[in-house]
């Protein structure tokens, strides 16, 4: 490809509304252009990269026997009402009404559509297992689209769905898809971690997320420094560092705390160690009209996913209002605690092991100090309620936990019979009786992968593509292309490289574009290999080669360039 025949749309300045590196560089490198908030046009340079990601995903899906299909992007509300997700999904679901007043949505995912397809096309266990996938545009009405392709309202996704006669068969396919996902991200040259995850609104049982490691990631991922244990922050089990509760050494006392509405104020005002304080968070209970208290240590954060999964707690989690607190307890949020609390409590595991600690007295501006379990109050229900923190013991007993930032690029789920039961998706089993199909679903954020790769591979000059993902493998830059010798040598090499199967971008912009600008553009775009053709080099029988990751160029004999490149470019 010649730049004279290509839309080379590089920009020198960084757009003011682009915060993360991938968004900045994709705009500057001419890969995408913003149409509206969360909506982007893929330009030729970016689309070449996107298609390469799609090709690798497609190859790995085909390799595990998945069948490619293409489902409608617009889905009827009736299917979502059958599954129960029409009301559950919330405002992120883009809804519309046609001229006949029928309700539809723009699909953020396709569980309902594929289940409808399966119940109409499958009738016997002999047709199972079956795994079908598509690569398609999805839609989500994000409240605050941000970070370019990281969190947009329209995105490209590969979603696959498998159907099985039983959970044992589902597990086999799930394991194969887990390996296929690892193959995809390994082939793309990404540093990634698969982690245990929560199923969220998709539903079902077990799941894993695949995260590209990057400081700009929105997710915290947790892993052990002594084993293969890894989970996202929502799923990671919090194990107390303490082995047992220390003996009581203080007397219980009621203390006036007029200026201590927060844990920080309590710690600062009374010289308490923060690990000797607790937070009492009152939420709506599963029983309508009731409240329940969740209690964690003062230096810990409530894990809302874990909390909402407690049998006695309403899901989704709803915090009690100040008015509800006053009505039920008679005190405000800054003065609550488990001692004499007229509500049921669930305490975190680490709270159970505390002694001589401080709690709100359920009286405004008062706290109890020197509180101890069993002496002053009974131990209530104990559960894992908090986020892990770095240094916690690994749940598998091997090593301690570390936390890094990650960008979620893939998620696989064992759905079980959640959708097949709701939508009556059955086949006749071996015994001739109807069987609800066990399902798996498997997603890769194809367009997000492109952005994640840039977050992981860039420098002050631009993107650093590997040979697998680069829009072009080689930038061929002639200096003074208008001269006969340079033009002849450049055109000959271009023909040889393209005939050998290399993807080459020949920068044939005229002399008004300086060599410095050409070099800077190719560095910005991130093309991994650069060859420069010049009068001076040709006079010496050489061309100049430079890798995107090397600081200094090297001279290569004209006769050796093709074999040299064949040895450098990974294909």
From Swiss-Prot:
Enzyme Commission number, as recorded: 6.1.1.15
UniProt main location, coarse: cytoplasm
InterPro entries: aa-tRNA-synt_IIb, aa-tRNA-synth_II, aa-tRNA-synth_II/BPL/LPL, Anticodon-bd, Anticodon-bd_dom_sf, Pro-tRNA-ligase_IIa, Pro-tRNA-synth_IIa_bac-type, Pro-tRNA-Synthase_IIa_type1
A cellular-component GO term for this protein: cytosol
A UniProt-annotated Pfam family: tRNA_edit
The reaction(s) this protein catalyses: tRNA(Pro) + L-proline + ATP = L-prolyl-tRNA(Pro) + AMP + diphosphate
Record's comment describing the protein's domains: Consists of three domains: the N-terminal catalytic domain, the editing domain and the C-terminal anticodon-binding domain.
Assembly and interaction partners: Homodimer.
Protein name: Proline--tRNA ligase
Organism: Pseudomonas syringae pv. tomato (strain ATCC BAA-871 / DC3000)
């Amino acid at each position: 490809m010649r730049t004279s025949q290509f839309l080379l749309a590089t920009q020198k300045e960084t757009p003011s509304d682009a915060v993360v590196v991938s968004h900045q560089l994709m705009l500057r490198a001419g890969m995408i252009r913003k149409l509206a908030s969360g909506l982007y046009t893929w330009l030729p340079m970016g689309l070449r990269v996107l298609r390469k990601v799609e090709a690798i995903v497609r190859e790995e899906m085909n390799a595990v026997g998945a069948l490619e299909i293409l489902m409608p992007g617009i889905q009827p509300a009736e299917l979502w009402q059958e599954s129960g997700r029409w009301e559950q999904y919330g405002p992120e679901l883009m809804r519309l009404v046609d001229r006949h007043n029928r309700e539809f949505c723009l699909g953020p995912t396709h569980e309902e559509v594929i289940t409808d397809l399966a119940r109409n096309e499958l009738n016997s266990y002999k047709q199972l297992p079956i795994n079908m996938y598509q690569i398609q545009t999805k839609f989500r009405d994000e409240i605050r689209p941000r970070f370019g392709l990281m969190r947009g309202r329209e995105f490209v996704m590969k979603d696959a769905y498998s159907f099985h006669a039983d959970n044992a068969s589902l597990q086999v396919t799930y394991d194969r898809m887990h390996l296929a996902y690892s193959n995809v991200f390994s082939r793309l040259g990404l540093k990634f971690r698969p982690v245990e995850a929560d199923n969220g609104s998709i539903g079902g049982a077990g799941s894993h997320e695949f995260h590209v490691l990057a400081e700009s990631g929105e997710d915290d991922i947790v892993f052990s420094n002594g084993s293969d244990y890894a989970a996202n922050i929502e799923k990671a089990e919090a194990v107390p560092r303490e082995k047992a509760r220390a003996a009581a050494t203080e007397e219980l006392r009621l203390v006036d705390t007029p200026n201590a509405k927060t844990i920080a104020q309590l710690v600062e005002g009374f010289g308490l160690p923060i690990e000797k304080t607790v937070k009492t968070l009152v939420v709506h209970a599963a029983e309508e009209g009731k409240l329940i208290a969740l209690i964690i240590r003062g230096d810990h954060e409530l894990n809302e996913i874990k909390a909402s999964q407690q049998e006695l707690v309403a899901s989704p989690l709803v915090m009690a209002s100040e008015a509800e607190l006053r009505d039920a307890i008679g005190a405000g949020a800054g003065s609550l605690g488990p001692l004499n609390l007229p509500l049921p409590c669930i305490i975190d595991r680490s709270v159970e092991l505390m002694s001589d600690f401080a709690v709100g007295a359920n009286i405004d501006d008062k706290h109890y100090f020197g509180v101890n379990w069993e002496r002053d109050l009974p131990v209530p229900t104990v559960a894992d309620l908090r986020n892990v923190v770095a240094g916690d013991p690994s749940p598998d007993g091997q090593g301690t936990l570390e936390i890094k930032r990650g960008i979620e690029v893939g998620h696989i789920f064992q759905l079980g019979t959640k959708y097949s039961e709701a939508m009556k998706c059955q086949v006749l089993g071996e015994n001739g009786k109807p069987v609800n199909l066990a399902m798996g679903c498997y997603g890769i954020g194809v367009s997000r992968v492109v952005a994640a790769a840039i977050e992981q591979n860039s420098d002050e000059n631009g993107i650093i593509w590997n040979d697998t993902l680069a829009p072009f493998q080689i930038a061929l830059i002639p200096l003074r292309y208008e001269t006969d010798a340079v033009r002849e040598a450049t055109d000959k090499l271009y023909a040889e490289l393209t005939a050998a199967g290399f993807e080459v971008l020949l920068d044939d912009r005229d002399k008004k574009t300086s060599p410095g600008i050409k070099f800077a553009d190719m560095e910005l775009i991130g093309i991994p290999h650069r060859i420069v053709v010049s009068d001076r080099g040709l006079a010496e029988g050489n061309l100049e080669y430079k890798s995107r990751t090397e600081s200094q160029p090297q001279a290569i004999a004209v006769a050796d360039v093709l074999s040299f490149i064949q040895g450098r470019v990974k294909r």
